[in-house]
Amino acid sequence: MAKVTNNRNRKPRKKVCILSAKGIEHVDYKDVELLQRFINNNNKIASRRVTGASARMQRRIANAIKRARFVGLLPYVKE
């Protein structure tokens, strides 16, 4: 019979931010491909828990997404 493992004792793996892993310091609002990674299916900004970003990078990401939406590069709502 197979041995059943208990996953409750394991610590969850810490998510690594895509930006810090690539060494990106500045988040540009014109880089739509990068910003779309931080938006979920309903075009909402993903939380830090989902993205694994630090507080500072999450603020920069959110501001860049808001600027891109204002300029018209990203949609506000799902089509």
Curated annotation (Swiss-Prot):
<keyword id="KW-0694">RNA-binding</keyword>
<keyword id="KW-0687">Ribonucleoprotein</keyword>
<protein>
    <recommendedName>
        <fullName>Small ribosomal subunit protein bS18</fullName>
    </recommendedName>
</protein>
<comment type="subunit">
    <text>Part of the 30S ribosomal subunit. Forms a tight heterodimer with protein bS6.</text>
</comment>
<dbReference type="GO" id="GO:0003735">
    <property type="term" value="F:structural constituent of ribosome"/>
</dbReference>
<dbReference type="InterPro" id="IPR036870">
    <property type="entry name" value="Ribosomal_bS18_sf"/>
</dbReference>
<dbReference type="GO" id="GO:0070181">
    <property type="term" value="F:small ribosomal subunit rRNA binding"/>
</dbReference>
<keyword id="KW-0689">Ribosomal protein</keyword>
<comment type="similarity">
    <text>Belongs to the bacterial ribosomal protein bS18 family.</text>
</comment>
<dbReference type="GO" id="GO:0022627">
    <property type="term" value="C:cytosolic small ribosomal subunit"/>
</dbReference>
<dbReference type="Pfam" id="PF01084">
    <property type="entry name" value="Ribosomal_S18"/>
</dbReference>
<dbReference type="GO" id="GO:0006412">
    <property type="term" value="P:translation"/>
</dbReference>
<comment type="function">
    <text>Binds as a heterodimer with protein bS6 to the central domain of the 16S rRNA, where it helps stabilize the platform of the 30S subunit.</text>
</comment>
<dbReference type="InterPro" id="IPR001648">
    <property type="entry name" value="Ribosomal_bS18"/>
</dbReference>
<keyword id="KW-0699">rRNA-binding</keyword>
